[in-house]
Design a protein with these regions (language model features):
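HhH-family (HhH-GPD) DNA N-glycosylase catalytic core used in base-excision repair
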Residues: 2-308
């Protein structure tokens, strides 16, 4: 559609056709406060397409793949204690998806109780600690695989290509993350020449085929009845999902007992402490957080991502 014939848009770039707005209370399952800015900027993968994050205005714009078609929504700070959600077209399923992405179903009260007694992490109890997740586990797994053994620019290139070429399109022209079926239908040439995924191409296609054909239930990894060891074992069995990707995915699945120790976290910890530290020393520092040790470690590393 030519720009001259496109439906008018509001100040946020959303089509004015059948626009709507709603609010969700910014409160965790235990009644604890939620810091929206720290949630939408909680990790780098959160800013990959189709997400667009503006920390200056505390805004997340994203396009969701819903049963009745893709829809673009804008999530921003509303009145005190609430988050404002704006969209165009169908509203069904959007609030549930946003609640899921912001982890408003999680209770971090136990973590905050320990953090409050830790001088270096007391600040986190004001609402930090919710790692923005994708609408589906499949999307998070694909994005995580695209972060392995490459520069960040390559990760952005790969995920952008997947969304731009395979994602379902919303009325405003933006695209959601592709479905397993769409990724399974793409051939090897697409992954090699368009996505330029390298060795990951075969892994991504195989993963999508297994999910699409019902051989693999990635969404089942979100089952809280599974132990951390069971989830880790299933993740490690996925094509392209080694120890690093598994540790990263465990965090995105809300399983924080393990620390993500990699080429970024180790030197960042050393910089903040003023000296290098062995992995066992780092693990000892956060042992008191028990099931939240990995989350405490991550927040320690990323405190300066948001100005106090």
């Amino acid at each position: 559609m030519f720009a001259g014939n496109a439906p008018p848009r509001n100040a946020f770039g959303l089509s004015m056709a059948r626009t709507w707005s709603a609010e969700l209370e910014l409160k965790g399952a235990g009644g604890e406060a939620v810091d929206l800015l720290r949630t939408i900027t909680s990790h780098g993968v959160a800013d990959l397409p189709p997400n667009d994050i503006d920390p200056d205005t505390v805004t997340l714009t994203t396009t969701l793949a819903l049963p009745r078609g893709a829809a673009t929504v804008r999530v921003s700070a509303g009145r005190r204690g609430f988050v404002r959600i704006e969209g165009a077209g169908r509203k069904a399923g959007v609030l549930e998806a946003v609640r899921h992405m912001l982890r408003l179903d999680a209770d971090l009260s136990a973590f905050y109780a320990v953090a409050t007694a830790d001088p270096e992490l007391t600040w986190a109890a004001a609402g930090a600690g919710r790692l923005l997740r994708s609408p589906t586990v499949f999307e998070d797994v694909v994005k995580t695989i695209c972060t392995t053994n490459c520069a960040w620019s390559a990760t952005v290139r790969m995920t952008t290509a997947l969304v731009d070429h395979l994602g379902p399109q919303a009325p405003d022209g933006r695209r959601a993350f592709p479905t397993p079926a769409a990724m399974a239908e793409a051939d090897e040439t697409f992954y090699r020449d368009v996505v330029r995924a390298g060795y990951r191409g075969a892994y991504l296609r195989s993963l999508a085929e297994d999910v699409d054909e019902g051989r693999l239930d990635l969404e089942g990894l979100d089952d809280r009845e599974l132990s951390d060891d069971e989830v880790a074992e299933r993740l490690l069995a996925l094509p392209g999902c080694g120890p690093y990707a598994t540790a990263h995915m465990m965090m995105l699945l809300g399983r924080y007992s393990r620390l993500v120790l990699d080429s970024w976290t180790r030197p960042t910890y050393a910089r903040l402490r003023g000296r290098k530290a062995a992995d066992r020393t780092i693990e000892r520092r956060f042992r008191g957080y028990r099931d939240y040790a990995g989350l405490a470690f991550w927040l320690y590393l990323t405190r300066d991502w948001v100005e106090s």
